[in-house]
């Protein structure tokens, strides 16, 4: 799984070189932020049902047309699938926080997502709205520490930047 550490080592190994000072500083920074990432991952794990529900509710509140006939949320089954997708991405964000890199999102979440959404007529903007709501809702210190929030928000923004 891709992380700052595995990416650094793989690149240097492919070049037949030792990691540079800059490489090691990057790895060290990643390790120093690990406690904050793990805190964010723990908080997400503990309350993911509520986070997913609020994100999905915000999405459907912003895009009310999604529940009209022929749209992505025109039946309870389709609405449930939207919540399932949000939950899936939250898990991938959680995994990315744990490993300290975007590997889980890149490998399991982003690849092909645009094509699937287009094929199923699912608007990416609705998912972006759900994650933007989650990002904007994070409250320090109610939800997590400031550094944990920075890590979590960074992961949410990463997902939104690729959509």
UniProtKB/Swiss-Prot annotation:
Family according to the record: Belongs to the phycobiliprotein family.
KW Plastid (keyword) present: yes
Gene3D superfamilies: Phycocyanins (1.10.490.20)
Coiled coil: none
Subunit relationships: Heterodimer of an alpha and a beta chain.
Subcellular locations according to the entry: Plastid, Chloroplast thylakoid membrane
Leader sequence residues: none
UniProt-recorded name of the protein: R-phycoerythrin alpha chain
Gene: cpeA
PANTHER family registered for this protein in UniProt: C-PHYCOCYANIN ALPHA SUBUNIT, PHYCOBILISOME 32.1 KDA LINKER POLYPEPTIDE, PHYCOCYANIN-ASSOCIATED, ROD 2-RELATED
One Pfam family, short name: Phycobilisome
Entry comment on modification after translation: Contains two covalently linked bilin chromophores.
Binding site for (2R,3E)-phycoerythrobilin 1: 82
Role of this protein: Light-harvesting photosynthetic bile pigment-protein from the phycobiliprotein complex.
């Amino acid at each position: 799984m891709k992380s700052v550490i595995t990416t650094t080592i793989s690149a240097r190994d492919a070049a037949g070189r030792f990691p540079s000072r800059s490489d090691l500083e990057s790895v060290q920074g990643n390790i120093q932020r690990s406690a904050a990432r793990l805190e964010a991952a723990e908080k997400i794990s503990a309350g993911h049902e509520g986070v997913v529900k609020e994100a999905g509710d915000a999405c459907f509140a912003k895009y009310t047309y999604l529940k009209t006939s022929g749209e992505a949320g025109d039946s309870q089954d389709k609405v449930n699938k939207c919540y399932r997708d949000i939950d899936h991405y939250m898990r991938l964000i959680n995994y990315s926080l744990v490993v300290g890199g975007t590997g889980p999102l890149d490998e399991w979440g982003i690849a092909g997502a645009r094509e699937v959404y287009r094929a199923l007529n699912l608007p990416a903007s609705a998912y972006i709205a759900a994650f933007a709501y989650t990002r904007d809702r994070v409250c320090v210190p109610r939800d997590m520490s400031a550094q944990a929030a920075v890590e979590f928000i960074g992961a949410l923004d990463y997902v939104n930047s690729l959509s």
